[in-house]
Swiss-Prot record:
Family: Belongs to the rotavirus NSP2 family.
UniProt KW keywords: ATP-binding, Host cytoplasm, Hydrolase, Magnesium, Metal-binding, Nucleotide-binding, RNA-binding
EC number: 3.6.4.-
Predominant subcellular localization, coarse grouping: host cell
Protein name: Non-structural protein 2
A molecular-function term among this protein's GO annotations: ribonucleoside triphosphate phosphatase activity
Organism: Rotavirus A (strain RVA/Human/Japan/AU-1/1982/G3P3[9]) (RV-A)
Compartment(s) where it occurs, according to its Swiss-Prot or TrEMBL record: Host cytoplasm
Function: Participates in replication and packaging of the viral genome. Plays a crucial role, together with NSP5, in the formation of virus factories (viroplasms), which are large inclusions in the host cytoplasm where replication intermediates are assembled and viral RNA replication takes place. Displays ssRNA binding, NTPase, RNA triphosphatase (RTPase) and ATP-independent helix-unwinding activities. The unwinding activity may prepare and organize plus-strand RNAs for packaging and replication by removing interfering secondary structures.
Source lineage: Viruses, Riboviria, Orthornavirae, Duplornaviricota, Resentoviricetes
Co-factor(s): Mg(2+)
GO biological process terms held by the UniProt record: viral genome replication
Length: 317
């Protein structure tokens, strides 16, 4: 995760701003600079290489002292920064909004995946500039639309029906901010269209999840799609989701946290996010993740058996 101010800076033209990507030498200069505390939140002028990010964001970049930041000297950083600027420059952003836009925290890996989709000549984003810009605006929180299958960050498709697409995320192969844990496995489920979904299509997805992914929890980050994650990583997701939710409220960022379909979401996660939306503390909400829940009447009871019998019936055909 990183603020948009880590990728670009605003330049006033007439009554609105044009956004310009940083270059790696300017960032490198900023990382070595001694800056007064009162200037830490201001864009840094490297004199030779142009404008650099505010020094308060030093920890967002990978250095000898900080291996958890972005690999900003890669080609991918330039590609992501340029793509962000293209999307922001498609909007008219004025003095009133520029600070809140640049302070927004975005998913670095999501944006790298959009670059990879853009560069894949078999992908719809390679052929449609409008859809690409729309996808980026959704990713950086400048659109109220949810991330659907067409505008998704992408990955490897492992399941699809008329209503849903399930992606295996490919963060292990990334340049900008790769996942270093080689045991990382995570999936995302997007809606093919933002419209009501039939019970039959929900049933197909639930059957797939129970049959193939019963060691994973289905959760949501509140952005209109599902995540399928290892149970061991649920607490980490909870901390991040709670922190983002509270930060958005503090920053005055209007964002609806969508709970999604309770029949699909892991029961404990649904309780956690419902409690969070009610304004409870992280400690109170977190307890719900590890609490034994009363089983709700399940409209899809026995689906795993149905799926198993259906697959057995195909043998010999």
């Amino acid at each position: 995760m990183a603020e948009l101010a880590c990728f670009c800076y605003p330049h006033l033209e007439n009554d609105s701003y044009k956004f310009i990507p940083f270059n790696s030498l300017a960032i490198k200069c900023m990382l070595t600079a001694k800056v007064d505390k009162k200037d830490l939140d201001k864009f840094y002028n490297s004199i030779i290489y142009g404008i650099a990010p505010p020094p308060q964001f030093k920890k967002r970049y990978n250095t000898n002292d900080n291996s958890r930041g972005m690999n900003f000297e890669t080609q991918m950083f330039t590609k992501v920064a340029t793509l962000i600027c293209e999307a922001l420059n498609s909007l008219k952003i004025t003095q009133i909004d520029v600070a809140s836009v640049l302070s927004r925290v975005v998913s670095v890996r999501h944006l790298e995946n959009l670059v990879l989709r853009k560069e894949n000549h078999q992908d719809i984003l390679f052929h449609s500039k409008d859809l690409l810009i729309k996808s980026v605006l959704i990713a950086i929180g400048q659109s109220k639309e949810i991330e659907t299958t067409a505008t998704a960050e992408g990955g490897k498709i492992v399941f699809q029906n008329a209503a849903f697409t399930m992606w295996k995320l490919t963060y292990l192969d990334h340049q900008l901010m790769p996942i270093l844990d080689q045991n990382f496995i995570e999936y995302k489920v997007t809606l093919n269209e933002d419209k009501p979904i039939s019970d039959g299509h929900v049933k197909e997805l639930v059957a797939e999840l129970r049959w193939q992914y019963n060691k994973f929890a289905v959760i949501t980050h509140g952005k209109g799609h599902y995540r399928v994650v290892k149970y061991s990583s649920v607490a980490n997701h909870a901390d991040r989701v709670y922190a983002t939710f509270k930060n958005n409220i503090k920053s005055g960022i209007a964002s609806d946290f969508t709970l999604l379909d309770q029949r699909i979401i892991w029961q404990n996660w649904y309780a956690f996010t419902s409690s969070m939306k009610q304004g409870n503390t992280l400690e109170v909400c977190r307890k719900l993740l590890f609490q034994k829940m009363k089983q709700e009447p399940n409209p899809f009871r026995g689906l795993s058996t149905d799926r198993k019998m259906d697959e057995v019936s195909q043998v010999g055909i």
